[in-house]
């Protein structure tokens, strides 16, 4: 893609079978855990987007040998820990990457300075830095811990920490810091969030104890853990699969299958919600890959209706609300999405940008402080807008999907950032029959 915009135009049905790109969360973690481990870690199916590649480069900065051996195939030679980097660690746009890396780095007697692109530098890091500081790490940076900042680690104390918000990133940062904390750590999670870190720590040889106490998850990582290199097969990313699948639901006559999608119940809230809206979504060929359940998902054009999305479902679909809002724009009735204030501190204020983009395309949207309501008419929205994405890849892809089924074309201003999570997005959609061209 070039610096030009990108335009999607309504056309005929979408048909075909595609494979979802590797899961972004697991790709980040495979790099970080591989660098922390002793010995060789091999990865297949890695998402080779800009965010994950920034994490790979960061691991090199901390002393790991990281090499690409083929498309999606990588080898990490870990040293059993992190060394002090000789230069600033630039994490690009990778919010997951920088938060998890800071947690891992806090366990070692080193000093590291982190920065990122303009979007990442605007995002607060205090939610991760606060528990790390309670464990004994120190940091120096801007208001609310915004990048750039310098972190000094080592000599960490154990910690029992109750998450003040549902955040897998904060949980993971504490667990990674706890690998080298005296006394280990316990994270108390009032609302369940994605559990990839717990699963992958076990795969690398760590003891992780998870208990449900009255509906509250307690995750304990005893002291003295050692990680050993392993093989990771990265499943398809459900957050990325959402885009071609929703396209299949809203473009008349379409049938789209996405193969190899991870079906972890803490990541599939969108699919549950779409089915409640009346979507024809069929999951088949369910199997296990590297400790995660995966399957193939087929979406057929559907006449959907509005629903009230339970706020407690938000952690299982927090990145999918923009594309859910697109589906809701074609549904009949109101789709109510509340309890999603976390969207305001993602790569952009996703509540505001989703509402603004849909309204520009003729959709009636009611924005609230902690969510929004889409008033669907059951008809294709007008479209015809140039949507400002503010550098947010999910806002960009969501509105391009809308344009494939709207009454007239929809353009977005900055397609380049789509590569952070879904390199090949435009090519995949064209392969299914979608009309995407430079604007």
Swiss-Prot record:
Reactions mediated catalytically: 3-phosphoshikimate + phosphoenolpyruvate = 5-O-(1-carboxyvinyl)-3-phosphoshikimate + phosphate
Primary subcellular site in the record, as a coarse category: cytoplasm
Q: Where is the active site?
A: 319 (proton acceptor)
Q: Which InterPro entries match?
A: Enolpyruvate_Tfrase_dom (IPR001986), Enolpyruvate_Tfrase_sf (IPR036968), EPSP_synthase (IPR006264), EPSP_synthase_CS (IPR023193), RNA3'P_cycl/enolpyr_Trfase_a/b (IPR013792)
Xref: PROSITE patterns? EPSP_SYNTHASE_1, EPSP_SYNTHASE_2
What are its E.C. numbers? 2.5.1.19
Q: Which Pfam families does this entry report, sorted A to Z? A: EPSP_synthase (PF00275)
Sites binding 3-phosphoshikimate sit at 24-25, 29, 167, 169, 319, 346
Q: Name one GO biological process term.
A: amino acid biosynthetic process
Summarize the protein's role: Catalyzes the transfer of the enolpyruvyl moiety of phosphoenolpyruvate (PEP) to the 5-hydroxyl of shikimate-3-phosphate (S3P) to produce enolpyruvyl shikimate-3-phosphate and inorganic phosphate.
State the family named in the UniProt similarity comment for this chain: Belongs to the EPSP synthase family.
- The protein's name is 3-phosphoshikimate 1-carboxyvinyltransferase
**Organism, per UniProt?**
Caulobacter sp. (strain K31)
Lineage, top ranks: Bacteria, Pseudomonadati, Pseudomonadota, Alphaproteobacteria, Caulobacterales
Gene encoding the protein: aroA
